[in-house]
Amino acid sequence: DRYERGDVNLDLKGF
């Protein structure tokens, strides 16, 4: 879901 919301950067950073 995060990827669809555009929070991919946060996931990559470990958030």
UniProtKB/Swiss-Prot annotation:
Single biological process term from Gene Ontology: symbiont entry into host cell via disruption of host cell envelope
Alphabetic keyword roster: Covalent protein-DNA linkage, Degradation of host cell envelope components during virus entry, Degradation of host peptidoglycans during virus entry, DNA replication, Early protein, Hydrolase, Phosphoprotein, Viral DNA replication, Virion, Virus entry into host cell
One MF annotation (Gene Ontology) recorded for this entry: hydrolase activity
Lineage top rank: taxon: Viruses
Transmembrane portions of the chain: none
Localization annotation: Virion
Function recorded in the entry: Acts as a primer for viral genomic replication. DNA terminal protein is covalently linked to the 5'-ends of both strands of the genome through a phosphodiester bond between the beta-hydroxyl group of a serine residue and the 5'-phosphate of the terminal deoxyadenylate. This protein is essential for DNA replication and is involved in the priming of DNA elongation. Hydrolyzes host peptidoglycans during virus entry.
Family: Belongs to the phi29likevirus DNA terminal protein family.
This protein's name: DNA terminal protein
Record organism: Bacillus phage M2
